[in-house]
Amino acid sequence: MAMRQCAIYGKGGIGKSTTTQNLVAALAEMGKKVMIVGCDPKADSTRLILHSKAQNTIMEMAAEAGTVEDLELEDVLKAGYGGVKCVESGGPEPGVGCAGRGVITAINFLEEEGAYEDDLDFVFYDVLGDVVCGGFAMPIRENKAQEIYIVCSGEMMAMYAANNISKGIVKYANSGSVRLGGLICNSRNTDREDELIIALANKLGTQMIHFVPRDNVVQRAEIRRMTVIEYDPKAKQADEYRALARKVVDNKLLVIPNPITMDELEELLMEFGIMEVEDESIVGKTAEEV
């Protein structure tokens, strides 16, 4: 099987890193050879696979060594659960420099050192927040990742971010091979959430590839710095991540999305009763005035 490169995007705090690591653990359990490249200065994209607080990042180690050229692949690449290879790009201190630059440096270093040549089945890029500009767009801008999966929920801002990320994909899809593989709904237990995300996916021309229900076992596993797959393999939630992994393996629906307007998104939310029909007469009125 040819190596597949996938990037996971989504609104900040939506559960991208947790979802990615549980998905990757399920793939490893299936016998797939996987590498995770964390593209977030927080360096939390690999902690559940490695059972660590935060992996040393390429940018930190490059600063200590002098330059990135002074690093060896084994300095930055750590193996975790199921033989999953883990790398964190890292970034500068908050408020200093461009964190996206760390992503560019990291991916270039991995390529030059031959990290992608080791009969891998999948590479996953876990990308910061909903930023699709600059360095954070590198996995899609430079055609590193061919498949994009967007983690979202039935909350308005998560859907807004999914639509924005779709716009970024369209921008780069026309000049390369990047495509949207689907929406992963990481449930927040909002009303009619699965129906709403299926409707959004239809409008974008894609699919809801899986609905991941909310379950406290995820937090219990995270406290122990473990994926659910490893912490409680018999849990129903572990089966949800296995189902997601199988769907990703079998996925053939890779599309250039059709982003919608803000008005269309609001209409969709109104249709599902998430948002009230707009009444211009109440705009700017205080609670007392209304």
From Swiss-Prot:
Sites of ADP-ribosylarginine modification: R101
UniProt-annotated binding residues for [4Fe-4S] cluster: C98, C133
Sequence positions that bind ATP: G10, K11, G12, G13, I14, G15, K16, S17
Catalytic activity: N2 + 8 reduced [2Fe-2S]-[ferredoxin] + 16 ATP + 16 H2O = H2 + 8 oxidized [2Fe-2S]-[ferredoxin] + 2 NH4(+) + 16 ADP + 16 phosphate + 6 H(+)
Molecular function GO terms recorded: 4 iron, 4 sulfur cluster binding; ATP binding; metal ion binding; nitrogenase activity
Cofactor: [4Fe-4S] cluster
Xref: CDD domains: NifH
PROSITE patterns (UniProt xref): NIFH_FRXC_1, NIFH_FRXC_2, NIFH_FRXC_3
Activity regulation info: Nitrogenase holoenzyme is subject to 'conformational protection' by FeSII; under oxidizing conditions FeSII binds to the holoenzyme and reversibly protects it from oxidation.
EC number: 1.18.6.1
Gene3D superfamilies: P-loop containing nucleotide triphosphate hydrolases
UniProt keyword annotations, A-Z: 4Fe-4S, ADP-ribosylation, ATP-binding, Iron, Iron-sulfur, Metal-binding, Nitrogen fixation, Nucleotide-binding, Oxidoreductase
Phenotype when changing K16 to Q/P: Loss of nitrogen fixation
Induction data: Constitutively expressed during log and stationary phase in sucrose-limited cultures, its levels decrease during stationary phase (at protein level).
Class of the enzyme per the UniProt entry, highest EC level: oxidoreductase
Listed GO biological process terms: nitrogen fixation
Pfam families xrefs: Fer4_NifH
Binding partners and assembly: Homodimer.
Family that this chain belongs to: Belongs to the NifH/BchL/ChlL family.
PANTHER family: LIGHT-INDEPENDENT PROTOCHLOROPHYLLIDE REDUCTASE IRON-SULFUR ATP-BINDING PROTEIN
Additional information: This subunit is associated with the molybdenum-iron nitrogenase component 2.
Function: The key enzymatic reactions in nitrogen fixation are catalyzed by the nitrogenase complex, which has 2 components: the iron protein (component 2) and a component 1 which is either a molybdenum-iron protein, a vanadium-iron, or an iron-iron protein.
Protein's recorded name: Nitrogenase iron protein 1
Organism from which the protein derives: Azotobacter vinelandii
Underlying gene: nifH1
